[in-house]
Amino acid sequence: MRILIATVQVPFIRGGAEVHAEGLRDALCAAGHEAAILAIPFKWYPPEKILDHMLACRLLDVSEVAGTRVDRLIGLRFPAYLIPHPNKVLWILHQHRTAYELWDHPLSDLVYYPNGSQVRDAIEQADRKLIPEARAVFANSRNVQERLKRFCDIDSTPLYHPPPNAEKFYSSSAEDYLFFPSRLCIPKRQELVLKALALTRNPVHVCFAGISDHPDYTDKLQSLARKLKVSKRVEWLGGITEDEKLSRNARALAIVYPPIDEDYGYVTLEAMLASKPVITCRDSGGPLEFVVDRETGLIAEATPEALSAAFDFVWENREEAAAWGRAGRDRYQSLNLSWSNVIQKLLA
């Protein structure tokens, strides 16, 4: 089959969504199909630009390319999943979040524009009307499935997939650090981790790996660490290679991942593959589908006090933390996450 993967791309930004699309393309090609990523440039401000992008997507005709039929369109992200195609399947990573669960959240921007409500209504109307055009609707996780049902009354099926290089993860003896690999940005809550670190009883050390979309945010985090007097217990690794990520995961005491209502989150699955316990929060969304409290990690309230207590616990109870990590690996294996299963579902 000739297959197009429809997504969006914010120039110069690379995260899990881009990795997801590439993983799907590679898996389709490995299965003998011809697959390509159709990435639409996306700008969400001012809000009327969102409407322009929605219209542009609806006007696209990708039923054939250069005289050859496109057999299937797989839509991943808004508004690219609105592109029409007679044989379209959706695997929704998330909707336009500031029009839904983040509408009145401090992270929202849409709510503060005079025309924000009108644009939000237009987004919801389009989703309600056009998502059901697809012959099948899959969600990236149960969290995304629940949002689709709650906000748009659309049924979908959760479809999990493995993280990149899943077969390369390994485990080694735990060293004296917690590892937090993620883009440096407000939704991932590195600030919360720094505030928690300032409250620990023990000399807990945290290694942050990742770069920021905005260099000034990195400066802000480092300034906060100095203000909280935890700079000596923090390591800023910046962007790291895949090999270094594998090594850091393998040698960590635990993995820290407390994002705000994450859609899915490769970090959790990578930790489980490395036999490491995960410390996350009750409002972290996707990770909660995999982390079992006090069995494969710790689920804390999203406060510095609660998170610091979790840090102290794994620091002081290393054998128990190691056992949770091994249980996490077993849990991952029981989930049967595979690209072959994903492709079978998307191409059925």
Would you name each region that the model predicts?
Residues P277-C281:
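Short hydrophobic beta-strand element within catalytic cores of glycosyltransferases
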Residues T218-I240:
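Nucleotide-activated donor-binding/catalytic signature segment of Leloir-type glycosyltransferases, i.e.
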Residues D293-E305, F313-R318:
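Conserved acidic donor-binding segment of nucleotide-sugar-dependent glycosyltransferases
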Residues S108, Y113-V137, Q145:
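Membrane-proximal helix-turn-helix segments that form the acceptor-binding/catalytic region
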Residues H205-Q222:
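Glycosyltransferase donor-sugar binding loop
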Residues F169-K188, L194-R201, C207:
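Conserved donor-binding/catalytic core segment of Leloir-type glycosyltransferases
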Residues A309, F313, E320-L335, N341:
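A short, well-ordered alpha-helix in the C-terminal region of glycosyltransferases
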Residues I260:
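Aromatic "clamp/platform" in nucleotide-sugar-dependent glycosyltransferases that forms part
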